[in-house]
Amino acid sequence: MSKMWSGRFNANASTLLDQFNASLPFDKELYLQDIQGSIAHATMLAKQGILSQEEAESIIHGLKTVKEKIENGQFEWNIEDEDIHMAIEKALTNLIGDAGKKLHTARSRNDQVALDFRLYVQQSNKDLIRLLANLMQTLINIAKNHTQTLIPGMTHLQHAQPISFAYHLLAYASMFKRDIERFQSSFERNNYSPIGCAALAGTPHPIDREMTAQELGFDAPTINCLDTVSDRDFALEILFNIATMFMHISRLSEELILWSSYEFGFVTLSDEYSTGSSIMPQKKNPDVPELLRGKTGRAYGNLMALLTVMKGLPLAYNKDMQEDKEGVFDSVKNAKISLEILNETLKTMNINKEKMEAATKIGHLTATDLADYLVEKIGIPFREAHFITGKAVALAEQKQKDLSELSLAELQSIDPRIQNDVLQYLDLQHSMNARNSYGGTAKEQVEKQIEYFERFLEELEG
């Protein structure tokens, strides 16, 4: 079968070339964006007198018919059509005749694919913002019920200081807020229309790029046609943003895996979002967070793949750039389902408050509070207080106690200047609520953080 570009060729493309060269098996994902762009283009061509109104109406009606056929499963895909643009144009021409051949006036596949792909990425930015907002709201809802639930705050996966479970969850809410802001920033930066750039240098036809930009929901046309058809930084941005988001998801997933183990027992994942073993009847495996952790590597790979594709390309379009889409489609689809299932996993898990609070009674979590007491009440330098507290911890270890369980007499054996008021400093709830500096774990600060994040989500929705 001859191609639409076959005029200068003396032989048909080989079947092997069709198999190697065609992007249709994956870029048919862009059918909706391709049709949207073509409708806007035809509308503009008619307004500019390049097409007659009758031709434009025939084209638009035909494109809507093609869309219905695709969505009803009646469209016949043929790899010889090469890509989604040619597949739709051929179907349109077969449907309405010669008017269909005029649609490509003042347009190249170079700006056409840049448009389709950008529309897809922009919609994906909006979808991911919505799903991240849902996840943030779930974290906030859980946090509201646990502003006083103690867990060990850790560094190096070792017990460090007492914090609230709410505070821990809000740390992830803060990360996901920044993820939302990255998607927002990318959307705003890339909300410019490629259509009308043609092959690389614009077109001599009297087109109206401002009109098509407005029709398609863009802020304005892109400023330089050569750049527009040559670069895929908008695709790299969403890949980077997804990779960063997955890094945050992976860290939360790792903690869910740890917390759901017998060794921690902080949470119990619901049966709906757990799996079993084919040989060990007792097993209840945290497959959801494990898969989320695994998919993070895949998101990183897609980012590095496109960076590598783009790094040495001369201007303008090169066929290498056909390799831009599959990784983006893959990352976007994985990101969407990952956000949905993580959200449901969090909503349905059981929180074992008693296990969390029991874990705070080991590991000497109030050691820093003792050092602070020595500085505040006795007036010694912090480094000296640090040393004395270390001696107290060593004594507690020797007596197989937690630091908070040492008696006043035992503490005074380390330093006789310690008085009875030290005991409140060693109380876990007091320790947590004493950290009332801005951004701290005290209940007052956590409630302010909840209010801050809820206000952010309200403004996002508005």
From Swiss-Prot:
Biological-process GO terms, alphabetical: arginine biosynthetic process via ornithine; L-arginine biosynthetic process
GO CC list: cytosol
UniProt entry tagged with the keyword Lyase: yes
InterPro entries found in the cross-reference section: Arg_succ_lyase_C, Argininosuccinate_lyase, Fumarase/histidase_N, Fumarate_lyase_CS, Fumarate_lyase_fam, Fumarate_lyase_N, L-Aspartase-like
Keyword Amino-acid biosynthesis: yes
Subcellular location: Cytoplasm
PROSITE patterns, per database record: FUMARATE_LYASES
CDD domains: Argininosuccinate_lyase
Keywords assigned: Amino-acid biosynthesis, Arginine biosynthesis, Cytoplasm, Lyase
Name assigned to this protein: Argininosuccinate lyase
Gene: argH
